[in-house]
Swiss-Prot record:
It catalyses: a 1,2-diacyl-sn-glycero-3-phosphocholine + H2O = a 1-acyl-sn-glycero-3-phosphocholine + a fatty acid + H(+). Its EC number is 3.1.1.4. Keywords: Antibiotic, Antimicrobial, Blood coagulation cascade inhibiting toxin, Calcium, Disulfide bond, Hemostasis impairing toxin, Hydrolase, Lipid degradation, Lipid metabolism, Metal-binding, Secreted, Signal, Toxin. This is Basic phospholipase A2 BFPA. Disulfide bonds join C38-C97, C52-C144, C54-C70, C69-C125, C76-C118, C86-C111, C104-C116. PROSITE patterns: PA2_ASP, PA2_HIS. The lineage of its organism: Eukaryota, Metazoa, Chordata, Craniata, Vertebrata.
Length: 145
């Protein structure tokens, strides 16, 4: 084998080994985004930095009904984690969307069904809650105590 080809092959193998340590993209969050779009009117990015609980983490008192939806979703994921090896952010599930109706179709009691039920409830809650633009991108350190 040509030494140049051997070096290229070695470089590809090393790259693949390095890529194996990169965490997978969360497919569940992609499904959650699709559920939100099926049930509601806002684009999912409108919720990422909303209030005290929408997006990563959450503390303090929810600012409004929509923020309470996010707090409830966080608690729902916490409960789903109690079922064995259930990691909600990475667990994919089966559901159907007939706008605006969402139906989770995995077996009841399974990790996938529990996570789907959490996302379904949140998507429906988001669709029913008013969106207060003043609560988007707030300083969580001062508003969420």
């Amino acid at each position: 084998m040509n030494p140049a080809h051997l070096l290229v092959l070695l470089a590809v193998c090393v790259s693949l080994l390095g890529a194996a340590n990169i965490p997978p993209q969360s497919l569940n969050l992609y499904q959650f985004k699709n559920m939100i779009q099926c049930a509601g009117t806002q684009l999912c990015v409108a919720y990422v930095k909303y209030g005290c609980y929408c997006g990563p983490g959450g503390t303090g008192t929810p600012l409004d009904q929509l923020d309470r939806c996010c707090q409830t979703h966080d608690h729902c994921y916490d409960n789903a984690k109690k079922f064995g090896n259930c990691i909600p952010y990475f667990k994919t599930y089966e559901y159907t969307c007939n706008k605006p109706d969402l139906t989770c179709t995995d077996a009841k009691g399974s990790c996938a069904r529990n996570v789907c039920d959490c996302d379904r409830a949140a998507a429906i809650c988001f669709a029913a809650a008013p969106y207060n633009l003043a609560n988007f991108g707030i300083n969580k350190e001062t508003h969420c105590q």
